[in-house]
């Protein structure tokens, strides 16, 4: 055959040709292991190429990965937005100086110290921050005592009650008290009371009840005693609110030893509660579940004398799922005839002829209207202002007190933690008086992490006087680190959430209320309703509330009874900025940039409670100090296994809680826009932990009866049915409002 000029570019070498072995059968892992062993035996295992190899000379070198899991440009590509696409808008370098210094520190090659860059590759803020802020002038307080009313005596209540109110520092009634007290003193009709938070609803219904009961004891004071029966039942949604109402009631009846009140709540001993009911009580403050339990099981609880049923915080009662318990209570009361006399024959002419139900709520949501239809009959609508009474109930919305100064700060996720510490440090440093602040966080695990992080590790005992409650608060009260200053050398830190036992929660709340030093409470929404804590100057919503109604109740912990107050809301750049328009429906919020917060907080010297390699110097800019603080926290967590685990758990719970906002507001909190890597930075983590949203592990093999084999079609049908059940439960969870599991 003639030579056709073709050349074969094959070099088979001089060695014998070995046949290719293909592994079949067995498990996948076994086949892979066998292939790897064969490659090693044949000398064909891949080796790293030399840097002098010709074909690779033109390839660009990869960016060096630092110890914290990030490339040298400061962006966490690995964890970027696992739920969706990467956020579109990023500033290449919002603060070039800080970013440039960070690069120079790493590029010198002499130091391998990790640099936590916080000011580069952050999402761009969509709304413009208003930096032209003057001194904010508070408008006229909407929940303050009325100036045109001389005192409580003008409302024709008992003079001894007026004296007790004077000892409590209360001289004049508020607007809602001026409406409700005269109505309940003279009328026997049901009432719906609508008023903003902090307006004094508790005294509005307690004072007329006590006045009418005291009229029975005017002549001699011997007709009424503790075993005369329960005249009023007050239902509160949370244990803390029930305890607070009971405390106020105890102060009011102090001059009347023949009157007795008690509180029955979940978490307490039912045996002790039964003993108190058996001895006799005149005023019963209860949570719905425990009250329904005693109605079923405590025979000593006589409902025939009950003249008033007060449903406090009706919207929260329905939100927390107490509808069935409330139905049971209302049905039991309706089934009992109202007695005209006491068991000893004393007439009850001063009391209403029928049982009166009073529903208190700050909103007129559909579930509240449902509760009203279930409990009220021909009710009178009472509000503080005439214009509120003329509003259509479908359009009435909650509003915060007018004198409350609300402002917000759009903070990138990476900067949230250092911004929070800076704000607390500057706040406590400029206050020369005793002050209290509350931080609201979305979940209990996150509360535990932030408490342990801000707690001074060198403090072993709670900074309170020795008492029987000292042991209860030993793990919930401590001296604070990072946020102290020469003006406030000692700040007392508290934590509270629903996972703590009731005695610990009660003792912690009491400690925070009575604390004489500057103090900070880190809590969930368990502290957002009805609690009247004195001298709260500031509320920080570190995590936005699950619903706007919860937001109003959170900020309502300050600016109570006409006093001024401040509230700061942290928001992320992006979809969360749409929440600002929702806020403008009830107030005029003021913006504050995170740069100004960091600059004020980093003016004073930072003091670290634990020594690490990160040591901020006074001469550096506030950008450098913020990055040094972040690096210090990361190093501290790496050296402390306990706090590192708390940070991981807090991060996971935070992500899960982020998906539980109400359906109407979920557009502002899009989890697909949440950057997990940057959010992990706010927990002092260098990379986002895994295991989010995996759910419960399920076994692949299903148990079947021995000797019985399921029909394939039947098995497939069962599987589809189980999947439908899981899907329905998931949809119910996603579409529902925040429940008690969200509040810790």
Curated annotation (Swiss-Prot):
Its EC number is 3.6.4.13. Gene3D superfamilies: P-loop containing nucleotide triphosphate hydrolases (3.40.50.300). A motif (Q motif) lies at residues 150-178. The keyword Coiled coil does not apply. The keyword rRNA processing applies. It catalyses: ATP + H2O = ADP + phosphate + H(+). It is found in: Nucleus, Nucleolus. The Q motif is unique to and characteristic of the DEAD box family of RNA helicases and controls ATP binding and hydrolysis. Present with 1460 molecules/cell in log phase SD medium. This is ATP-dependent RNA helicase DBP7. The lineage of its organism: Eukaryota, Fungi, Dikarya, Ascomycota, Pezizomycotina. The gene is DBP7.
């Amino acid at each position: 055959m003639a030579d056709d000029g073709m050349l074969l570019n094959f070099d088979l070498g001089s060695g014998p040709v070995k046949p290719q072995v293909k592994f079949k059968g067995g498990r996948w892992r076994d086949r892979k292991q066998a292939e790897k062993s064969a490659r090693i035996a044949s000398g064909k295992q891949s080796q790293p190429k030399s840097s002098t190899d010709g074909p690779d000379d033109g390839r660009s070198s990869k960016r060096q990965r630092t110890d914290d899991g990030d490339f040298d440009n400061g962006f966490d590509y690995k964890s970027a937005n696992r739920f969706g696409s990467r956020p579109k808008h990023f500033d290449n370098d919002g603060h070039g100086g800080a970013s440039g210094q960070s690069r120079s520190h790493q590029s010198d090659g002499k130091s391998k110290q990790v640099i936590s860059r916080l000011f580069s590759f952050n999402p761009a803020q969509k709304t413009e921050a208003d930096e032209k802020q003057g001194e904010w002038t508070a408008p006229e307080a909407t929940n303050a005592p009325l100036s045109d009313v001389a005192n409580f005596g003008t409302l024709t209540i008992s003079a001894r009650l007026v004296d007790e109110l004077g000892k409590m520092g209360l001289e004049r009634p508020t607007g809602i008290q001026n409406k409700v007290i005269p109505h309940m003193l003279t009328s026997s009709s049901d009432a719906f009371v609508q008023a903003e938070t902090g307006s004094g609803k508790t005294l509005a219904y307690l004072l007329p009840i006590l006045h009418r009961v005291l009229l029975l004891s005017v002549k001699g004071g011997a007709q009424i005693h503790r075993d005369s029966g329960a005249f009023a039942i007050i239902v509160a949604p949370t244990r803390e609110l029930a305890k607070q109402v009971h405390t106020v009631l105890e102060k009011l009846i102090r001059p009347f030893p023949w009157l007795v009140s008690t509180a029955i709540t979940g978490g307490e001993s039912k045996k002790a509660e039964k003993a108190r009911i058996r001895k006799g009580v005149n005023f019963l403050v209860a949570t719905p579940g425990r009250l329904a339990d005693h109605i079923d099981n405590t025979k000593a609880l006589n409902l025939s004398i009950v003249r008033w049923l007060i449903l406090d915080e009706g919207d929260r009662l329905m939100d927390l799922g107490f509808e069935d318990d409330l139905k049971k209570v209302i049905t039991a009361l309706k089934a009992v005839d109202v007695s005209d006399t006491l068991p000893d024959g004393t007439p009850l002419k001063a009391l209403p002829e029928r049982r009166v139900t009073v529903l208190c709520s700050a909103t007129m949501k559909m579930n509240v209207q449902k509760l009203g239809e279930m409990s009220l009959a021909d009710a009178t609508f009472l509000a503080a202002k005439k214009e509120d009474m003329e509003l259509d109930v479908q359009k009435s919305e909650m509003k915060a007190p007018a004198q409350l100064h609300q402002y917000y700060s759009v903070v990138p996720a990476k900067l949230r933690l250092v911004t929070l510490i800076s704000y607390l440090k500057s706040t406590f440093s400029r206050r020369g008086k005793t002050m209290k602040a509350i931080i609201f966080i979305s979940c209990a695990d996150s509360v535990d992490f932030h408490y342990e992080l801000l707690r001074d590790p060198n403090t072993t005992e709670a900074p309170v006087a020795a008492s029987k409650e000292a042991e209860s608060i030993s793990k919930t009260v401590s001296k604070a680190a990072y946020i102290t200053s020469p003006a406030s050398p000692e700040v007392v830190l508290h934590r509270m959430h629903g996972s703590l036992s009731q005695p610990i929660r009660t003792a912690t709340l009491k400690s925070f209320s009575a604390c004489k030093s500057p103090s900070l409470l880190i809590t969930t929404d368990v502290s957002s309703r009805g609690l009247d804590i004195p001298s709260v100057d500031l509320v920080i919503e570190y995590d936005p509330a699950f619903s706007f109604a919860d937001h109003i109740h959170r900020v309502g912990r300050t600016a109570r009874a006409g006093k001024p107050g401040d509230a700061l809301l942290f928001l992320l750049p992006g979809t969360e900025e749409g929440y600002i328009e929702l806020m403008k429906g009830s107030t005029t919020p003021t913006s504050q940039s995170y740069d100004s917060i960091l600059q004020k907080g980093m003016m004073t010297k930072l003091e670290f409670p634990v020594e690490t390699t990160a040591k901020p110097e006074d001469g550096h800019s506030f950008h450098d100090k913020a990055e040094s603080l972040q690096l210090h926290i990361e190093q501290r967590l790496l050296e402390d296994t306990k706090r590192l685990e708390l940070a991981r758990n807090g991060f996971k719970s935070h992500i899960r809680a982020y998906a539980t906002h109400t359906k109407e507001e979920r557009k502002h909190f899009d989890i697909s826009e949440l950057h997990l890597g940057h959010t992990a930075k706010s927990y002092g983590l260098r990379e986002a932990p895994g295991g989010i949203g995996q759910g419960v592990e399920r076994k692949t093999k299903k148990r079947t009866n021995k000797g019985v084999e399921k029909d394939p079609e039947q098995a497939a049908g069962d599987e589809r049915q189980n999947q439908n059940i899981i899907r329905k439960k998931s949809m119910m969870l996603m579409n529902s409002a925040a429940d008690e599991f969200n509040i810790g």
